[in-house]
């Protein structure tokens, strides 16, 4: 099926910043679009998000990226077969000519890459997850629900970026989603009773000013119990420390103090002994590989240790981490690497080497639910896409509810 047109426009994401929406048209009349997300806490080695840097939108306009789609990319890709995803992505990579898409912009390339996949699925009349994953795409992921926000995702006193709950003790996705929605509402009541703000952060979680980074966990434990669920058995806790944001001159600064890597690791060990923590993401900075070795040696057999800024969905960096025995899981963000093909290659490398994969949104999102299908397609087993609040977050959960009706299996207790 031949691609007859490719074009893009500048639209707004959930933070009110511009982003790229790309469209792909086919000879059978199919027209598909996709919107690119954007992160606030970003790894230094992520693919380049091309911004205009002029007066429009405080420098964050994306008209250059849009123009690249409408001209350079369209000239190269129009006329190609939409079902040749790898060839199309490789052609855009070659066209850009850099490792990090610094010429065309990863936001331009990814928008087209996503729209191509969606157009192909629509043309065939099959779900996106089935097109990308084939017959083996049948696992609904366990979500990480970010219900208290801190760090770069909220203007508050909390250093850790995300405090999440994971519903394990449920037979189906819809029951797991209901449980977390109830926990979220009970959390709101508890925060109100304690006199804390219930304003929400970028990802839909509450963003109160709390005294330290343990208090959110204590309050979440109360909310789990108040909602009628059992911590540790039905609901577990996950943290995203985003420690690169706290790293200064070889040490970590939080709660007005400085910590060495070893001291921060000991703090995590104590938290894991005290609370039912399943996962810690970016527990140390992306450049602190020696610290990561120590963290992995200490906790890899007890919890999930996720590299986000550490690996930036990059196959080469992940391979180095595997060789050095660093972390045991990877966060998967397509816009960190720039194309659907490259994302899939990274996931396959991780899975072959026993690393868990977590499909992830960004803090700047849209109503596009692509990653919900992508998580099922790649059998990642876990997905991270915010709280049960804000429609750009719920768009992904609602899409997973739709997929649940199509003979899929929820991992639940099986992780």
Curated annotation (Swiss-Prot):
SUPFAM superfamilies: Enolase C-terminal domain-like, Enolase N-terminal domain-like. GO terms for molecular function: magnesium ion binding; phosphopyruvate hydratase activity. Binds a second Mg(2+) ion via substrate during catalysis. GO terms for biological process: glycolytic process. InterPro entries: Enolase, Enolase-like_C_sf, Enolase-like_N, Enolase_C, Enolase_CS, Enolase_N. Mg(2+) binds at residues 240, 281, 308. Its main location: cytoplasm. Its EC number is 4.2.1.11. It holds the Pfam family Enolase_C. The active site is at residues 203, 333. Keywords: Cytoplasm, Glycolysis, Lyase, Magnesium, Metal-binding, Secreted. It catalyses: (2R)-2-phosphoglycerate = phosphoenolpyruvate + H2O. Pathway: Carbohydrate degradation; glycolysis; pyruvate from D-glyceraldehyde 3-phosphate: step 4/5. It is found in: Cytoplasm; Secreted; Cell surface. Its cofactor is Mg(2+). It comes from the Bacteria. One of its GO terms (cellular component) is phosphopyruvate hydratase complex. (2R)-2-phosphoglycerate binds at residues 161, 333, 362-363, 384. It is an enzyme of class 4 (lyase). Catalyzes the reversible conversion of 2-phosphoglycerate (2-PG) into phosphoenolpyruvate (PEP). It is essential for the degradation of carbohydrates via glycolysis. NCBIfam families: eno (TIGR01060). Belongs to the enolase family. This is Enolase.
């Amino acid at each position: 099926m031949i691609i007859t047109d490719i074009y893009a426009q500048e639209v707004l994401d959930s933070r009110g910043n511009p982003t790229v929406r790309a469209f792909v048209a086919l000879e059978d009349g199919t027209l598909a679009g996709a919107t690119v997300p954007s992160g606030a806490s970003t790894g230094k080695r992520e693919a380049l998000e091309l911004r205009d840097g002029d007066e429009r939108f405080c420098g964050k306009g994306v008209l250059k990226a849009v123009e690249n789609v409408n001209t350079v990319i369209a000239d190269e890709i129009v006329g190609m077969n939409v079902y040749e995803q790898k060839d199309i992505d490789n052609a855009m990579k070659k066209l850009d000519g850099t490792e990090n898409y610094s010429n065309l912009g990863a936001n331009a390339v990814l928008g087209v890459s996503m729209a191509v996949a969606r157009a192909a699925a629509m043309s065939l009349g099959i779900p996106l997850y089935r097109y990308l994953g084939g017959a083996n795409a049948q696992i609904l992921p366990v979500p990480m629900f970010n219900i208290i926000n801190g760090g770069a995702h909220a203007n508050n006193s909390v250093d850790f970026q995300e405090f999440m709950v994971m519903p394990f003790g449920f037979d189906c996705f819809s029951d797991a989603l209901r449980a977390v929605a109830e926990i979220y509402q009970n959390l709101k009541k508890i925060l109100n009773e304690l006199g804390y703000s219930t304003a929400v952060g970028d990802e839909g979680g509450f963003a109160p000013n709390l005294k330290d980074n343990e208090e959110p966990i204590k309050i979440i434990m109360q909310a789990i119990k108040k909602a009628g669920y059992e911590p540790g058995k039905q609901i577990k806790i996950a943290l995203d420390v985003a420690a690169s944001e706290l790293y200064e001159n070889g040490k970590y600064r939080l709660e007005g103090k400085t910590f060495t890597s070893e001291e921060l690791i000991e703090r995590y060990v104590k938290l894991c002994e005290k609370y039912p923590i399943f996962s810690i993401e970016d527990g140390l900075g992306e450049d602190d590989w020696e610290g990561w070795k120590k963290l992995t040696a200490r906790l890899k057999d007890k919890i999930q240790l996720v590299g986000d800024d550490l690996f930036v969905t990059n196959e080469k960096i992940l391979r180095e981490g595997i060789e050095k025995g660093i972390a045991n899981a990877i966060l998967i963000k397509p816009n960190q690497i720039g194309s659907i093909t490259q994302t899939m290659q990274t996931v396959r490398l991780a899975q072959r080497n026993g690393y868990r994969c977590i499909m992830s949104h960004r803090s700047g999102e849209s109503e596009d639910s692509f990653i919900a299908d992508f998580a099922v397609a790649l059998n990642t087993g876990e997905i991270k896409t915010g709280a049960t609040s804000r429609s750009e977050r719920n768009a992904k959960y609602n899409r997973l509810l739709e997929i649940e009706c199509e003979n899929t299996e929820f991992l639940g207790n099986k992780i």
